[in-house]
Amino acid sequence: MAVTDGDSITAAQYNGLQSRINTVMGTGSGDDGYGQVLASSQVSAGDIITAANFDNLRTDLNKANNHQSGTNAAIGDIAVGQIIGADASGTDLASLNVTTEGFNDYDAAVGVIETNKLLLNAGNSSVEAATTSQRTAAWGGGGGGTVNHTFTVTFADANARRHFFNAGGEIRFSATRTGGSGSKDTDWSTLLTNMGTIKMNRTQTTSTGSGTGTSIGNSDLTGTYQQIFSKSGSGLYAENLYRIQARQDSTSVLRFNVDFQDNDLGDDQGGAGSTGPVDENVTGTLTSTIQQLRATGSNVSVATPTYTNTANL
């Protein structure tokens, strides 16, 4: 809450600012909270608010703003000996044009951070390998077939899961098929290449390529599998399907099922003299790759979960 020119800044007002940044940077609840340890803390009623108090608060604001946008908050450093004003600070009237050092400037900076709490600047994150599954044996053909890659993502607790996604974390999916030269092999390779990388964040699942995403993210998961993404084949192989399903096993464990459905039942490709539809196997090497985008660095860094394969391709 802003203060009026001429008013004293009370412990309660400082604590109000500190509480708001703690909601974003600390444990929080729901879509608030990155799970970080703050430099600032509450002060006691009647305490004089010092430059050191504001230095610690500024540290927390700068870390949060950097995490979100890559720059420090629009506030100045308050030096020892300065008087903290409503909209400026200084040791005498002549220096009160320092317009980023007042209490209200800090108040406004916290407001920006609250608005941008779910943003993540790319420079404050890392894309990291999580798990993979690979198959070299032929599959599909002969009337259809499905191979699956199922894995769990285990967080330390429900808060750690929430902090991972609140801080901009994503679980990412991609796949490739190499080797082999059949037309079905080629279609699967094209399907997997064209879908790009699939990204599940806090509230949605999208892809960098083509396919059907959903408005289902971490906060929408239940104890029952939900389809969060799909991508179909094309032409003669339009029935073939790559699909991702997701559910929560508990408040701290997510489970994903990635299936590759060879639903094509064969097409009459043989020309004159053919005996009927031909349904080829899928050959070559099929790889399902899982990565994560995680908030990292000196501003906000969240713990990585553990990835465990429970079914391989």
PLM segments and residue spans:
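Extended, charged low-complexity segments
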Residues: 203-313
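Extracellular "spike/adhesin" assembly and maturation modules
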Residues: 1-136, 140
